[in-house]
Amino acid sequence: MRVVPYGETALYVDLEIDDAGARRERTLAVARALAARLPDADVVVGAGTIAVVGVSGWDDLEATVRDAMRAPPLGQGSRLHEVRVVYDGADLAEVAGAAGLSTSEVIALHAGTTYDVELVGFLPGFAYLAGLDERLVLGRRAAPRPRVPAGSVGIAGPYTGIYPQSSPGGWHLIGRALGVVAFDAERDPPALFQPGDRVRFVPSHVD
């Protein structure tokens, strides 16, 4: 583990764990332990990293982090979201070709996994969902789109995700989520998906 100052009122924690599954579980457990110990701070989860913002007193903070590292695993208390998806994305056929699969096989693989929300970033409410079948792991598009519609379901690298707002984007689009408001500034918390939640996609059709 590496703990370093991150400006005058923040610190950065790198758990330095290589295994993706173990890294994800440990990061969330430590982040929740830190949030409980530092209720006035903002604890921001990354991929195996944690930023703690709005704190001071380096020596005490380092001791607090090392104490939080002993936090037990989270267990099975996370929320499960089931998201209906119409698999008609603009890149579905291209993804299938790159993976050497049929479009039906791509859909079955994507919908056959329960994903973990590893972190939220890029856009407000954009959840990086870990657990993508390795056969669907692709680099980002060579040319990002200037506009990706809100609700689009994409894949890039080891992640899948739902675009919460219309924005530029370079992920491969394979479908669109139905009835999901991934971010609402009037909601508490504004982001629907939180680190530690789980997400399952359900293939659907529009009547």
Where are these regions (language model features)?
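Glycine-rich active-site loops that engage anionic ligands at enzyme catalytic sites
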Residues: 1-207
